[in-house]
Amino acid sequence: MSGGPYFDDLAVGQVFDSAPAVTLTAGMAAVHQAIVGDRLRLPLDADLSAAVTGAPAALAHPGLVWDVAIGQTTLATQRVKANLFYRGLVFHRFPVIGDTLYTRTEVVGLRANRPKPGRAPTGLTALRMTTIDQADRLVLDFYRCAMLPASPGWPPDEERAGDDLSGVGADAAAPAHDPTADWDAEAFRRRVPGPHFDAGLAGTVLHSSADVVSSAPELARLTLNIAATHHDSRISGRRLVYGGHTIGLALAQATRMLPNLVTVLGWQSCDHTGPVYEGDTLYSELHVESACPVDNGGALGLRSLVYAVSDSGPDRQVLDWRFTALQF
């Protein structure tokens, strides 16, 4: 389908699984790190990664993994106008460099937006995305909601708005086993200076320095993201930055404020509260909502509120992201 499906071309149960598989390489990892600037230690330090995880290759950055997975799903949302939220993203396995990712995308809900005078009709599409590796091992299983335009001339049915999408992702399954259970926390602590996990972090609010958004289309291309709004300014008058780019910068800022984060275990919620454009300057306010000891360290419940600097008015909030990170 040239240009991708419109909202009314989709049906619940429809599957998109023909995106190219992607082998994670050191080159991809380097380009990704150059764009988002993340400082997670294990993806950057192959020796440390081997000592902690026991894997034969360096751990792939979790942001690279979810960016590739999301990019593979854009066959269904090439015409997307906005991506509203993600739900239930949790790592069932942490890939390493050399692993190959395959993603299956299924339409699980459709809801037409209420018609507005002077605006073309649109609808919300809820998608379930399942990512496996070359050995059919589950990596990710999560949901997102995208707003798509309806086809020209499509008459919205005001009698039947569609599915209730409020519960999308609420029943996302937890991993069958902890993918970090065999990681060596003591090896990390021996090699990396403190501070390490401290339950007293709960309640802390940290404020980041800022980052300019650059190389936005390059990140989209790197991760197979073909949503036209990230590449073609004619779609909405200005290219919209891929939401994962904003998330990537938020995580990079978190790693500067908490330099001994080990990895991201999963997301509780992720809402794009405003648009981001190339050249915007973003900063974040990081709330440590919880700090819970686990067998090999601690799990930090984090909330990142990201803002875009404005020259002419109040700074705009653009992201509200709750996630859980592992700290040793």
Label for each model-derived stretch:
Residues 7-10, 23-24, 59, 89, ...:
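Hydrophobic beta-strand core residues of beta-sandwich domains
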Residues 236-240, 265-267:
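A beta-strand-loop signature enriched in Asp, Gly, Thr, and Trp
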Residues 50-111, 245-289:
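Hydrophobic beta-strand-centered segment that forms part of the acyl-chain substrate-binding groove
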Residues 1-52, 149-237, 297, 324:
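Non-catalytic linker/capping segments at the edges of enzyme domains
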Residues 20, 87, 125-127, 204, ...:
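Structural beta-strand/beta-sheet cores of well-ordered domains, especially the beta-sheet scaffolds
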Residues 45-56, 115-119:
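Intrinsically disordered, low-complexity coil segments
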Residues 2-12, 97-180, 278, 287-328:
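HotDog/MaoC-like acyl-thioester-processing domains
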